């Protein structure tokens, strides 16, 4: 059983609200979950403390058990100082058209 810490959408249409949950990766996004760890309200101001609430003790416990955080939850854990998020290796950006034509000899 692959366990994931992820966001489950709640709220109404046009008013998103997310619960931070531990769930089996095979369960639907908004379906069954094992435990609720907190919430995230994206409509609040970014500097508002009530925008994100996590039970960090439970999060650390699940990470120790092998749960993998989703990309967004990994960002939250990085800002909370629980777990360092690895930087992604972005591919090189495309070469501008002028340089491409000059390299082709046209």
From Swiss-Prot:
Keyword Ribonucleoprotein: yes
Domain of life: Bacteria
Gene Ontology molecular function: any one: structural constituent of ribosome
Pfam families: Ribosomal_S16
Residue ranges of the region described as Disordered: 84-106
SUPFAM superfamilies named in the record: Ribosomal protein S16
GO BP: translation
Keywords: Ribonucleoprotein, Ribosomal protein
InterPro entries: Ribosomal_bS16 (IPR000307), Ribosomal_bS16_dom_sf (IPR023803)
Entries under NCBIfam families matching the protein: S16
Family: Belongs to the bacterial ribosomal protein bS16 family.
Identification of the protein by name: Small ribosomal subunit protein bS16
Gene name of the record: rpsP
